[in-house]
């Protein structure tokens, strides 16, 4: 088709985190310049902007937690700290000149599809009309607060880890932390080294694998800077190890699961000396059923004299502290909630309405599902990045976003050339895709009896049950038959006379 016939779309990107930055860069490389990025906060960064708790770091090796086109030889640690990751995304955004296209401190409040376009209203009451909307709002960005009676009655300082209060000095304080997931383990490992008195309230023990957090010297950084091939090799090695150990261990490969299970159990047995404490820290579910924690510091932290593990269930929160079901009040000055996020909210509470005014809540009333994690029937030209059943878990989310971004660009190209009048997966394609996902879940570790944020309200894992290689392969070429080929009528069709 001649270039004169290629349509040039307007695109709105919601969020200037890792995926939003990536999408803007890729769109411009594809010759699409009419791009608006709406960011609710004052700067880019997403997860790494919002999570500033002590000890925050990525549990994926830093040299593979970068864009494929922008390596970073300057990481200080194998597991990069949050401030360095935030700095990396800010630097990439500057280098790419994205600041002029990002509208900071402006959230998207309404997103309605009508007359073949998306009509947007922002928190500043600005109006936009665009062809495509890309929701790059991320997965874990709506803090989940525990449903514990009396939570609001606590008389001391209290906050969620994603809303860390840096004005409060924990030194000399009686601190309680609810939760033992990945974030909690990082916080506990860090603040246990202060002179606070720390009580950890554990509902569920976690499996932990120890991987040393290597520090890179300036000489090593210089060598990596001068030799891009060495840097690329390091990235490939980390990716190979993760794909063939952790990723395969949770999706049904027997030998990788045996290896990872042995590593986790050996770590606990070797590094927790007290048999009573070790018993409390021993999970009652298979390794990998919940997100595996990567930490070389957690068990050491839990054995410090100023750290106390409380496994008795919480009854309520009082003004003085946490009251357990045995009637004991654990008096506290500070209460920290490491209780995770709401993983199924995605772009909500945005007022998102597709064709015929159908809301996203109505579309997802029975089940939060999408076609290939990205396309929602009834919401034409709308892409949900890192949606349900993306392969989230002990692998680089950046790699996932790059695969999805390339796939979205191929779909937009089909629209530009006129092969697809709109980009909208059919309901049948969505149902078949999710049946395919469900068929693969039986061999995964996520269905083996534990409760985790991976599971939806029906207890089904919102994960990818097959290999990483298979996921990449299935996003290489869009299946045209899975998409609507005739634009649905925007008005009620004429009916024959009686």
Which residues are covered by each model-predicted region?
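Beta1-alpha1 glycine-rich phosphate/pyrophosphate-binding loop at the start
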Residues: 3-13, 18-102, 202-203, 270-276
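Rossmann-like dinucleotide-binding core of oxidoreductases
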Residues: 3-8, 12-13, 18, 22-29, ...
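Core beta-strand elements of the Rossmann-like FAD/NAD(P) dinucleotide-binding domain
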Residues: 9, 123-132, 325-334
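FAD-binding beta-loop-beta segment adjacent to the flavin cofactor pocket
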Residues: 49-58, 149-150, 297-299, 354-381, ...
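Feature captures the FAD/FMN-dependent oxidoreductase FAD-binding
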Residues: 77-141
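Glycine-/small-residue-rich beta->alpha transition segments that form the dinucleotide
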Residues: 113, 130-132, 136-143, 181, ...
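Glycine/threonine-rich phosphate-binding loop and adjacent beta-strand/alpha-helix elements that clamp
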Residues: 334, 338-415
